[in-house]
Amino acid sequence: MSSKEQKTPEGQAPEEIIMDQHEEIEAVEPEASAEQVDPRDEKIANLEAQLAEAQTRERDGILRVKAEMENLRRRTELDIEKAHKFALEKFINELLPVIDSLDRALEVADKANPDMSAMVEGIELTLKSMLDVVRKFGVEVISETNVPLDPNVHQAIAMVESDDVAPGNVLGIMQKGYTLNGRTIRAAMVTVAKAK
């Protein structure tokens, strides 16, 4: 009897036994590997999670810094624009009493007197020149009457009964007001009409 023909006590050839054992080992190995978790895999997963979290924090930080820089740039531009726009405010405030004095001089001047006509004309020209210059720099005079009272540009001093002007409208100007580029630098002192 040759070795190939020899049977094992169970009646199987040795090659069959080896094949059966090999299949059993293969069947057992996946279960064993599923149960065994390599500690390095856990560490890698943990490090990957930490890396993703750090990248998210870094990305958020970069976005926050960019937003802060953009806001700072905008605020700086606005501050510079306001500084240019309203740099003359202090100077204009110093000129207002001079303009008021020229206005009062014209109000009290005797325009009917021929001897005073040259002086009145000089005051008028000086006032006109000064107002033209300040207008070039964004100054506007608040002196309209018969317009609704605006607390942003008018300061009511008195209320006077009137049939000619609607109630709540400006009846008269006691002192002119001025704005610089839309900002009130001095409110006009006015009398306001009220119903009889």
UniProtKB/Swiss-Prot annotation:
Query: SUPFAM superfamilies annotated for this entry?
Result: Coiled-coil domain of nucleotide exchange factor GrpE, Head domain of nucleotide exchange factor GrpE
Q: Please give the name of this protein.
A: Protein GrpE
Q: Which PROSITE patterns match?
A: GRPE (PS01071)
Pfam families, alphabetized:
GrpE
Q: What is its main location?
A: cytoplasm
Q: Name one GO cellular component term.
A: cytosol
Tell me the Gene3D superfamilies matching this sequence: 3.90.20.20, Head domain of nucleotide exchange factor GrpE
Domain of life according to the entry: Bacteria
| Keywords, sorted A to Z | Chaperone, Cytoplasm, Stress response
**Its Gene Ontology biological processes?**
protein folding
What does the record give as the function of this protein? Participates actively in the response to hyperosmotic and heat shock by preventing the aggregation of stress-denatured proteins, in association with DnaK and GrpE. It is the nucleotide exchange factor for DnaK and may function as a thermosensor. Unfolded proteins bind initially to DnaJ; upon interaction with the DnaJ-bound protein, DnaK hydrolyzes its bound ATP, resulting in the formation of a stable complex. GrpE releases ADP from DnaK; ATP binding to DnaK triggers the release of the substrate protein, thus completing the reaction cycle.
Assembly, in brief, is:
Homodimer.
Q: What terms describe the molecular function in GO for this protein?
A: adenyl-nucleotide exchange factor activity; protein homodimerization activity; protein-folding chaperone binding; unfolded protein binding
InterPro entries in the record, alphabetically? GrpE, GrpE_coiled_coil, GrpE_head
Which residue stretches belong to region Disordered?
Answer: 1-39
Q: Where does the record say this protein resides?
A: Cytoplasm
Entry keyword annotation includes S-adenosyl-L-methionine? no
Annotated family: Belongs to the GrpE family.
